[in-house]
Every structure is written in C-alpha cells, then in structure tokens.
Amino acid sequence: MHPFNIVSRADIARLPRAKPDSASSGGSFAMEKFATALEMVTEMKPDLPVFAARPHAAGRAARWFINNFPGEVAYAYKANSSVFLLGALYGAGIKQFDVASVAELEDAATIPGVRLHFMHPVKSRYAIRRAYFDYDIKCFALDTEDELQKIIEETDGAKDLELFVRVSVPAKNSRVPLEHKFGISGQKAQRLLVKARQVADELGITFHVGSQTTTPDAYAMAFEEVKKHIVKAGVVVDAIDIGGGFPSRYTDSVPARLSDFIEVIKASMAKMPVTEDCRLICEPGRALVAEAESLIVKVDLRKPGNQLFINDGSYGALFDSAHLGFVFPVRLIRPGLDPNEPLEPFEFWGPTCDSIDHMKGPFMLPASVREGDYIEIGNLGAYARAMGTRFNGYGEYIDVILQDEPMYSIYTEDLEPIARNA
C-alpha cells in the first residue's frame, strides 16, 4: 500500500474497481494483487484495458539511484503520478520531486516531508506566486531574463531563492531531443547567469540531454558546455542539476549500462570549476518507473495482414508507440499457450474512430493470436498513464498490482529478492 496513505484526484477517478481497505485509515485503497498477468486475466476477464503496476520494480530502481548516483535524486513527477508507484518511490527513499505545473505541485505537496523543485523554465505569474507563498517552493528554473524578472516580482524580491539557469546542450543519441524548446546558450546564457547570481541565494545550472538517451557520452558533452558557461560568466555555482534522460530498455532500444552513465557523470563532475560543496542533482523519470507498469489489452478483432484491433491506443497509453515510434515488449496472455509457437510481426490499431490511432510496431506475437486474446504491453510505466485522454469516450482503466518481474530490466545488478507477499 501507499506508505503515506494518499490518493490524488486523478487516481481516484481511475479506480472504478478499487475496494476500500477497511484495515487501514484515511481512505486508502486495497488494490487486487495477482502473481502474474495470466492469473489476473483468468480471474477477471476484463473488458477494459488494465494498468498493471509492479511497485517492487519502482522501489528497486529508486534504491539503485539512491545507492549509485553521486548526489541527490529527485523524481520527475510528470512521468507517472500513480499513487502506487509514488508510494514505492517514497518508501525507497525518494523525497524530492521535480514538478512542472500548479496541479503537479498541489498533488506532490500532500506527501509528507518532500522537497519540491519547480523546474519548468516558463511559468505563469500565478504559478510562481502560488508555489512560493502557498507551498514554500524556493527552487525555480528559468532560461530568459524575462522569466527571471517574473520570479523576482512574483516572490516580492525574495532573498532565499534557488535559481537554476537552463542551458542548451547537445541531445546526442536521445530518442526525444529536448534542446529546441528550452535552454539558453552563448553570451545570453552567461549574462543570465550573472544576473541570476545577483539575486539568488543559491545559483544553479540545469540541462537536459534528451529523453531516452542511450549513451553516456551525452552527459560528458553537456558538462563541457556547462563548464564553458561557468568560466566565461565568472560566477560561483552552488548546484548542477543534470535533469533526466536516463534510459530504459525497449524492444527497439538497448541502452548502455546505467553504471556506465554514473561513471561518466562522476568523471565529468570532478572536472567542473565548482566548490567541493556544490550540489549535484538528477531528475530521473523514465528510468525510475518504466519497468514498474505494463498495460494489458484485449484483442477486439484481427484483420488480414496481421492487423490487431485492441482496446487502447494512441489516445490512451500508447501515445509514444504511435507518435514517437517506440516498440514496447509484448507477450500473449492465454492459458495453455505453446511457448514454442512461432512469432510473427503484428501492428496495432486503437479503439477510436481516428485513423492515426495506429501503432506500427512491429510487435512480435504468436501467429495464432485472435479475437478475445489478451496482450501484455510491457515497460509502459513512463508517460503512458500520463498521456491518456477521453477521446471518443475511451480512457477508462482497471488498476491491479502484479508481483512478477517486468519483461525487461536495466537493473540486472540488483539481485534483491522480491517480497511477493508484502
């Protein structure tokens, strides 16, 4: 169960099958637990798509980062705000959260003892004021002088601000480059660092190497850019926030080992012109929760050409597959399935009437897959739940907890046994 006993408004709306847990207080929810997806579909035979959480996987990922990253670990709240995964992260020791909106900070602020970072570089005046005065948030990101002025004005010239200047860095080998919308470069960056230093209690630099970055040299290149800005601006920097970008494993994406990323980050940080007490912060999202949730869908129809029509799609949890081309691992969930049956490539169509509701794949499944079968789509814990809509009236899910292992894991060095009955 969720260790701090909260359920957000969004999660309550998603729990049509949740049952109140009479053994606990505060309105918590007892989700149905199953050993495997096969056990779940055999018992429930769901008509709705099912989000299958594996909180133990989120906890393991959090412990790995806390034990191996040479600094502070803050979770990127936008990746997945499921109450079950947040509980696992919090229970494993994640006590800092990167939020990007008033709604996110309102939800995250209900968690006891957490520290929030408002790292969206462009915020409304209302959001800045709410964050500072109502939620005691001191930490803000920015990438323009105009945003700096907004922060100064809306905090009434506060003297306790932690200001992080977002600089642009190369997005090498990232699946989703992020350097175009946010980030300042060149002399403008150096001028902004100087101006922010004049009003900040703590000055930081932040960057993002891009989402699903598969090679660690991207961080080395980013640190080199940051080093140039610090030297040319001639400022003392109190913190460096390297953002997220840490990868997960997918069918079409096999990244370098996480330990290789950590070694590059350690070596790069050692070369930075900063004091010994300079804070180093990371904000993983995908790497913490991707393995911790999967989606179980039902096949509504099979058409010639290995086309499967399923009950969720691009307007739901499969946005990244449809629009960014991610190929997630899949497996057929059917009692008595022959494990040696040959696999064939399939493409998916979602349930809406829109023709762009299409996931090209290829998704490798047994040749006999048919209407009425269930398919588990794995490693969907990052952004799938967050991207869902109610287009065409779809977007309703069942939530369950599974106690088996995810299809892929990048935490192979963690041999910690799973407490299946916890």
Language-model region placement:
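Conserved, mostly hydrophobic/aromatic
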Residues: 58, 78, 101, 131, ...
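Conserved active-site and cofactor/substrate-binding residues in soluble primary-metabolism enzymes
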Residues: 53-60, 80, 84, 146, ...
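Short glycine-rich, flexible loops that bind phosphorylated cofactors or substrates
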Residues: 149, 172, 384
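Active-site-proximal loop/turn and secondary-structure-junction residues that shape catalytic pockets
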Residues: 79-81, 103, 122-124, 144-146, ...
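A charged N-terminal "starter" segment
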Residues: 1-161, 194-200, 232-236, 402-422
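Active-site loop/helix belt of alpha/beta enzymes
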Residues: 2-9, 17, 169-303, 392-394
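Short beta-strand segments
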Residues: 76, 143, 162-168, 206-208, ...
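Charged (often Lys/Glu-rich) extended helix/loop segments that serve as interaction or gating elements
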Residues: 264, 279-422
